[in-house]
Curated annotation (Swiss-Prot):
Job of this protein: Removes 5-oxoproline from various penultimate amino acid residues except L-proline.
Name the UniProt record assigns to this protein: Pyrrolidone-carboxylate peptidase 2
Underlying gene: pcp2
Xref: PANTHER family: PROTEASE FAMILY C15 PYROGLUTAMYL-PEPTIDASE I-RELATED, PYROGLUTAMYL-PEPTIDASE I
Coiled coil start-end: none
One Pfam family this sequence matches: Peptidase_C15
Family statement drawn from the similarity comment of this UniProt entry: Belongs to the peptidase C15 family.
Signal peptide: none
Location(s), subcellular: Cytoplasm
Main location: cytoplasm
Annotated source species: Ralstonia nicotianae (strain ATCC BAA-1114 / GMI1000)
């Protein structure tokens, strides 16, 4: 049986919800093209988040891992290209930790690329009417920390597994707490994630399309 692990993150920075977990939870138990989706919530706590991610991988033995996180301020599903080996926390995590300029993994490589077909996913999302783009930076907070931890685990312990990270926008209800922030309806985000999973399962390579930026 093929398993897809999809993770979301608990709420942080005073927000009552986190759409990344709302999406993952909505997809838990669904079957897409013969694969079963299994959802896990991860904490917004440095170190612990990656330990719980590895535990979830070991418990579920997925062939594909799709890690999700909130990027409040973005207006589209952002399929991340690269994870970097640094934590530079602008705000404390949910346990009060605020590491600055420390590596995610001591002596780890500077960066890892996603092993998802990022451009194929963006192309499929746009074709389905869901706003999406390739993102060149997952930031330096917990999302990048999780993304790097996932790719390090794949590189060192699970080379046949594929995985990557997608940042999701705020929902309208969440954006209303922060006037001026863009949003995307939760049902559209859930539908988009189904497209992302289906595309990742069906695509081993990637499309040769421009997804870069000028700055």
């Amino acid at each position: 049986m093929t398993t897809v692990l999809i993770t979301g993150i608990e709420p942080f920075e005073s927000d009552p919800t986190n759409p990344s977990w709302d999406i993952a939870r909505a997809l838990d138990g669904e079957r897409i093209d013969g694969a079963t989706l299994v959802a896990r919530q991860l904490p917004c706590v440095f170190g612990r988040a990656n330990r719980e991610l590895v535990a979830a991988i070991e418990a579920t033995q997925p062939s594909l891992v799709l890690a999700l996180g909130l990027a409040s301020g973005r207006s589209e599903l952002s399929v991340e290209r690269v994870a970097i080996n640094v934590i530079d926390a602008r705000i404390p995590d949910n346990a009060g930790n605020q590491p600055v300029d420390v590596p995610v993994v001591a002596d780890g490589p500077a960066a890892y690329f996603s092993s998802l077909p990022i451009k194929a996913i963006v192309h499929a999302l746009r074709a389905a009417g869901v706003p999406a783009a390739v993102s060149q930076s997952a930031g330096t907070y917990n999302c990048n920390h999780l993304f790097y931890g996932l790719m390090h685990h794949i590189a060192t312990r699970a080379p046949r597994m594929r995985g990557g990270f997608i940042h999701v926008p705020a929902t309208p209800e969440l954006a209303a707490r922060h006037p001026g922030r863009p949003s995307l309806r939760l049902d559209a985000q859930i539908a988009g994630m189904r497209v992302a999973v289906r595309t990742a399962l069906a695509t081993q390579g990637d499309l040769r399309l421009s997804g870069g930026t000028l700055h």
